[in-house]
Structures are given as C-alpha cells and as structure tokens.
Amino acid sequence: METSALLKQQIAKEIGLPQKHVESVIHLLEDGNTVPFIARYRKEQTGSMDEVQIQTISERWQYIQHLNQRKEEVIRLIAEQDKLTDDVKRKIEQSVKLQEVEDLYRPYKQKRKTKATVAKSKGLEPLADYILTLPQDDRLAETADQYISEEKEVFTREEAIEGAKHIIAEQISDEPSFRKWIRQETFKKGIIKSGAGKSADTDEKNVYEMYYEYEEPIAKVVPHRVLAMNRGEKEDILKVSIEPPADQIKAYLEKQIIKNRSTSVKEILQTAIEDSYKRLIQPAIEREIRKELSEKADEQAIHIFSENLRKLLLQPPMKGKTVLGVDPAFRTGCKLAVSDETGKVMKIDVIYPHAPVNKTKEAHEKVKAILEQHQVEMVAIGNGTASRETEQFIVNVLKDMPRNIYYVIVNEAGASVYSASELAREEFPELQVEERSAVSIARRLQDPLAELVKIDPKSVGVGQYQHDVSQKRLNESLRFVVETVVNQVGVNVNTASAALLQYVAGLSKSVAGNVVKKREEIGKFSNRKELKDIPRLGAKTYEQCIGFLRVQEGTEPLDRTGIHPESYKETKALLKKLGLSTEQIGTAELKDKINQLALSETAQELGIGEITLKDICEQLTRPERDPRDEVPKPLLKTDVLQLEDLKEGMELQGTVRNVVDFGAFVDIGVKQDGLVHISKLSNQFVKHPLDVVSVGDIVTVWVDGVDVQKGRVSLSMVK
C-alpha cells in the first residue's frame, strides 16, 4: 500500500470513521474545497460528516504529513553520517509522534560544545566504552592512566575518569527508551508545585493565594489550574516546578545500565547516572512536561472559548422588531439609538438621568417620546458601567407607557472595541464612538450574529485565560467557529455587511468588499447569477460561496433557499414530477406532496443521492429555516432586581453568560453574574460544565449564598 493510503488509513482508525469517507474528505480539501461547502454539499462523499469532523481530518492530515516529512529528513541526516541501522530506521518509521522522532534523532544530532564533546575531543571515548563493559577486575586505574596526555590536556587519572563519566552521562541522556520511560513515569508519579515568587507582594487582591503553597499530582492537575500557575509565573508572583519520582528513576537507570552489580566500576556508573539525570535529563523532561501540560490546557481553554462563542453567535435574532439601544453611563450620559426592523438607525440621542447631572425628569420624558414616536417594541440595555441604575430608570419609564414594552440586558462586551474601530467609522462616520455603541447594543438584540462578526472574537467576553494561550491557535479556532455558524445560518446577500460576508465559504475580505461595492452600484442583486460579474469572484469561489448566499424576492425563487445552483435542474425536475412550480416553495401543498414521496426511488429517478434529495426537500418545505430559531429567546424583563433583594433559597430564571472549567456564570438580573460551581450544576457527576450548560441557555437557579460586600452571588441548579 502506498504511503498516502497508509496515512489516510491511520487517520480513519484514529478518529473512528470509514476510510473511504476520510479519503474523500482529503481529496475534496486538496481540490480547494472549503470545510462548510464539503459539510453541506458533499454529504454523499463524506457520509454526512459535520464541520468539526472535517476540520479534524484536515488538521490530522497536515500533522501526519509534517511528521512524515520530519521522519524522512531524520533518516537522511543519520544516513549521511553512515550510522543508520535497520533497527533505528524501523523505529523512526513506526513513530506516531514528533517527540518520538526527535528522541530517536537526539544521539545523532550535531551537538554544540558540551562536557561530553570536550571529553571526546580529548580521546576519552574508548575509556567510557571500557567502563560500560562492566569490568570485574580492578584495572580501571591502570586503564585510565593510558589516557593521561599533556597534549590533550588530560593531566591526571581523575580527569580521565571524569571525562569518561561525562561521555557516559550524555549517552544515557540520549537513549530514546530511557527518555520515554522517564517521561511517562514523571507524568504518572510526579508532582507539580508552586510557591510565592519574587513579586508575590504585588498580588494585592490575593488572586494567586491558593497557589502560594500548592502541590498536586501531574496526572490530576486540571487545565485551568495549569493556566493560572503559568500566568502567575509569567508575572513573577509564583514559582512553579516539577518534583519527579527521582529515586525510582535513578533505580530504573541503574538496573538498565549496571546489569552486573559486582562490577568494580559500580560507583563510577552511579555517579554518571546521577549526573546524567540531574544535569541533562530532569531539566529537559520538566520543560517537556510543562510544555505538554500548557498545550493541553491551551487546547481546553480554546475549546471552551470556541463552544461559548458558537452558542453566543447562535443566539436567536429578534426579527422585525424596532429596538431602542441604550449604552449606560453616569457623567457622560446614556447614549440612545433607535434601530428599525431592518437595522436602519432612526434616531440618536443622549440623556443624563444619573449623578452628577441628575436630569432624571427630562430624561424620562425624552425616552417616553422616543418610544412613542418610533413605536419601539423592545429596549436593549448594555450591561456595563451604570447598567443597573439605567435599568431601574428604564423600568420606571416603561411603567409610564400605555402599552407593554419589554427590555433585555444585552452583553455589551466588545461594543466599545467595535465602536472605536475602522469598520465602525466606515459604517457610521457621522456618529461619536459612544453613539455607535448604542447602535451596536440595539442591533445585538435584533441580529446577534450580524453584529458580533464585526468584533474581534477575543473581545466578546466568553473566554477563559484567552490572553494566555497560543494566539495563533486561538485565532484559527475562533475563525473556524465564526465561519461554521455564518454558513450554517446563511447570509442575505442584499443586506449583509462586508464583515459578515467575509466569513462565507470561499469569500476573502477583499472579495466581500467587492460584493458590497457591486450591490451599492446596482441597488440590489436580483439573482445569484449576478454575483458571477463581481471582480475576483471566479468559478471556484462562486461554487464554494453561492449556496450560502440568499437572494430574497429575486427573479429565481430557488435563490432564497440553501439549495445549491448545481442542483437546480434536479430540483425543478422534482417540482415538475409533483405538479408544482418554484412559486409554491414553502406552501402547505408542497409539504404534503413531499411527505408522500418515496425518497429512494425518486433519488434514483433524478440521478442524485438520497441524502442530497432529503436536503433539497427540507429546503423546499422550510426555505426560511434558521437554526437560531430553535434556541430559546432571551429573557424579556419588566422589573429590576437588586443584590440586596436576594435571599438564600430564592428561585430565579437566568441566562448563562460564560462557561469555564469550574462552573458557569449566570446573569440573574443583579449587578454581578452569579457562579454555579461545577458541583452544583446537577445531581449527577459532571465531568465538564459544557456537558450541562451552554452560553445563552435560560436556566432555573436557586440562590446558594450572597456576599453583598464583595458583590458575589453563589447559585445552584440543584434544588
């Protein structure tokens, strides 16, 4: 079997998916297809894999290719030294991790100047080899004397033996099987410890207090504690170290090296082993383990952030509602923005209901007039500074209205970042930064996805240690999440911003800009075909993006569905078979007729796969389907709650704002989000909070404890 096929077989085995589907995915990716396109429109070839599975295959394929390139390179480098044996070659070829390949290459690596290389240059390698033969006789002194040489700067017998010990120490350190065993043993039985660092006195809020005298088995340390220790170490507040099972490791090395315990060189070898472990192996293994723990913790933090972001982006839109956005503040005033049902800004204003200005009555009348004039149906209040005071003020205004108007507290994380960005300046050149924030808050309620894509995902407030992890890996993961959600939802090509369009499969930032430019020139797109005229939107890009772009009320009714134009011919043949036309998409009559279809026979008749036919039928019956509609709507409120109102045992409804390794933060309508600790999420054992809750979930909680002074609320989801 050729190497490429073996690698694909390996990936299929690793992730537990059929090899033919894995091979199809790799072929499609190498052919320039995007992950969303493959997931949506190539289900027959992939066995209906989702985006995450396809991305996993893509990442594993890249890693294995890189691993194999390194294997070939290492084999070549060792062969060039005429030291490549069949055994070494076989071990390299059978390695499944880069670390294993590097361990095998270590003895052959060109070394910088070390104690061992200096000793070798003095001709002491034969003496080291002699010691390793474990001689029984007492001829070491006599043998060592043969290596005394003024020319080579070996002046005494002791210096000769010392040099030989350095060579032996390095040989022990370079042995791959020893390294592998020591690494595994340290992971299994070692302890990670932390104590106060040089700058511990700067930790005024005692953020790292629990880590000043802390130790835990490496095998049990959880990711968020690794990240906390790393951060504390970086700030010089903590000192972190690994305590290995040193005695067991040295005993293992002695057993492997001193196989004849009665040898006359036993003590010399014990000293060499001690030196090898302490000076060469232990520091390297500690670095490797710390690196591995950090990488795993990074991956976990990135996974949590990605899951939280996905749920945040999938928050349901409040379609067709006119919303008043309020960006709260004290001294500088609360900024107001009315956004109509299409997202168009109808009114910008400012009020000063709070101290130090205290124009509460004037503000009350102004908001009341705005609500009436623009027939506002909902109020969105940002959750930043002065949020609770503004909430109380808005509640008083709403009570004075003749009709029911609800309000929602909107997570405004990142709104100020967006408002000061170049993108916001382009969108609203005539508005001040704070006024743009009010617009963003209103639109976040109307269409969270369309608004949140304008903000750097790292600024949306749902992460955990996001500034401490690999920024490259984090950015890649978050971009993948945004792309996946945008393409799952679909995009109205006549209303979408360039910020949203750039996440559509196949579209780059510049091509997304060209789409908007063309739309402004022609007024609006009448059908999907018109996008073929856009500069730099070639045939491949068109194929990748077009199924995710919708044209509402255009000249081709199928353009408002998620059906790809490549399937229009078969779709129209299906409609003809049913005695229907494209004008009847989404009607009850069409739904009834499709429900009576024999899928397998019809698919054969049309010459398409059954899965593709199923998707076409789904789109014809529910052309406006939005996956976000299946998510609970945000909590609508009419009254305010104070921290002082909370009593132990009180039952409340809240919205999950953030999920972290140790629990979930829930907004229950008071100033501070309450924490549901992982132990209070369920009566059952919970491995991770994400198994129980997600960002945006509406949950019932009970108050477990309130610390008014510290502004802390403990909650429970178990009655």
Label for each model-derived stretch:
Residues 102-106, 115-116, 130-132, 326, ...:
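S1/OB-fold single-stranded RNA-binding interface
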Residues 38, 123, 327, 379, ...:
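Residue-level signature of catalytic and energy-coupling elements of molecular machines
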Residues 41-43, 245, 328, 341-342, ...:
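Short, ordered loop/turn segments at secondary-structure junctions
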Residues 1-23, 30:
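Generic start-of-chain signal for non-secretory N-termini
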Residues 247, 266, 276-284, 407-492, ...:
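OB-fold/S1-family RNA-binding modules
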Residues 320-325, 335, 391-394, 527-530, ...:
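Short beta-alpha junctions and helix-cap segments that line functional grooves
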Residues 53-56, 63, 67-77, 81-325, ...:
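Duplex nucleic acid-engaging cores and interfaces of nucleic-acid transaction enzymes
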Residues 34-35, 46, 50-151, 488-630, ...:
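Accessory alpha-helical DNA-binding modules that contact the DNA backbone or grooves
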